[in-house]
């Protein structure tokens, strides 16, 4: 009888431990889903003005794809990513067959964003926006953030963190080569 009671108590402890583990995993997944960009996520369409004075629509590609690069001028990871971001911009037309546009979104004042874009030789339009609410709609809590948006307004590729490897470049270029959108699923690649 005592052995049966101990076995039952042990089984109960294991079952409760497993339920606690699953609850924590679900909470982590929900928290990440609510705060990080993910493949298949719909993004809003927001009108903004780039530093060159042109009207731009984030989340609404003029072509088949829109590559959005969120950064801040004081971020060391953004500075480290700048050379490969510039390389991505240079290879985008060839990889997408001219069906992709790239926009930089600096979460800084216009003067700082313009100086940063010139310093790093960004040949793509840059938008200066200090509106954190707009950035949060794209889940740009952490920078650098690189998103590839399809014509349907869904994220096809998301990368949070430094873009400092060829894999980061290839991920973006592969996303703009694909014909079909990826299904919704959890994932951001962090480095």
What is each PLM-predicted segment?
Residues 178-191:
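Compositionally biased, proline/threonine/alanine/serine-rich low-complexity intrinsically disordered stretches
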Residues 1-43, 191:
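N-terminal targeting signals for export/organelle localization
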Residues 48-49, 125-129:
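Short acidic-hydrophobic, aromatic-tinged amphipathic segments that line or gate anion-handling sites
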Residues 118-122, 130-177:
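Thiol/disulfide oxidoreductase modules built on the thioredoxin-like
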Residues 67-68, 102, 146:
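Hydrophobic beta-strand anchors of alpha/beta hydrolase catalytic cores
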């Amino acid at each position: 009888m005592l052995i049966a009671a101990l076995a039952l108590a042990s089984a109960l402890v294991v079952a409760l431990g497993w339920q606690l583990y699953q609850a924590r995993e679900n909470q982590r997944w929900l928290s990440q889903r609510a705060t990080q960009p993910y493949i298949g996520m719909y993004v809003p369409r927001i009108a903004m003005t780039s530093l060159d004075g042109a009207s731009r629509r984030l989340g609404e590609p003029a072509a088949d794809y829109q590559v959005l690069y969120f950064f801040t001028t004081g971020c060391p990871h953004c500075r480290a990513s700048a050379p490969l971001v510039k390389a991505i911009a240079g290879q985008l037309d060839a990889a997408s067959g001219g069906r992709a546009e790239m926009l930089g979104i600096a979460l800084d004042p216009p003067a700082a964003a313009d100086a940063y874009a010139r310093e790093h030789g960004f040949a793509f339009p840059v938008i200066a926006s200090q509106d954190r609410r707009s950035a949060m709609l794209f889940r740009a809590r952490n920078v650098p953030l690189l998103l590839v948006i399809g014509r349907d307004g869904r994220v096809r590729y998301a990368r949070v963190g430094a873009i400092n490897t060829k894999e980061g470049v290839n991920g973006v270029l592969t996303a703009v080569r694909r014909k079909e959108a990826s299904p919704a699923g959890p994932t951001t690649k962090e480095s």
